[in-house]
Amino acid sequence: QNQSGQTGCMNASAGHYVDTNGSTMQAPCGLGTWNNMTGQSSCTNASAGHYVDTNGSTTQTPCDAGTYNPSNGSNSSSDCGDVPAGSFSGPGASSPTPCSIGTWQNQSGQTGCMNASAGHYVDTNGSTMQTPCGLGTWNNMTGQGSCTNSSAGHYVDTNGSTTQTPCGLGTWNNMTGQSSCTNSSAGYYVDTNGSTTQTPC
């Protein structure tokens, strides 16, 4: 109460506080603090993932998506740093979120991760790169955490393949995950594509 002869006192305004008895004035919440209620004796530190850059604030401001801030009581947007490659964040993040299996991100400050391309995989969280399927393996879908072995009677002879190829006429194999097929032996023949056996003459 800042006037004499009064019959009551005034509540501190939102964004302000009074922390002593008999006060004639209210004080604004300082940088890095805020409150949104009247009649308060203190202010609240900005939460992790947020900041308050004005005095007398009734709100805290979330860090932008793609950034994070692990500290309480921050008073500037510069306290929000870019999330590292291999991670992402939404608004108001206190920590980066790692890219999940099947996804990756090779740039910092991002709001999401990319699916692994077909013919590729990502088998760890927080990855900054995707890996092509190796010889004898393939996949034809995005966002995968692994590749599939080629079926018996088929092969994959290139890295990053989205398809498997059937063994041609005169060739065969009876194992999965192969990068080539075997010519039929003398005295045998193979007259179908994708064969897992050879036939004696």
Feature roles, as predicted:
Residues 1-201:
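Disulfide-rich, cysteine-dense extracellular ectodomains and adjacent flexible linkers of secreted
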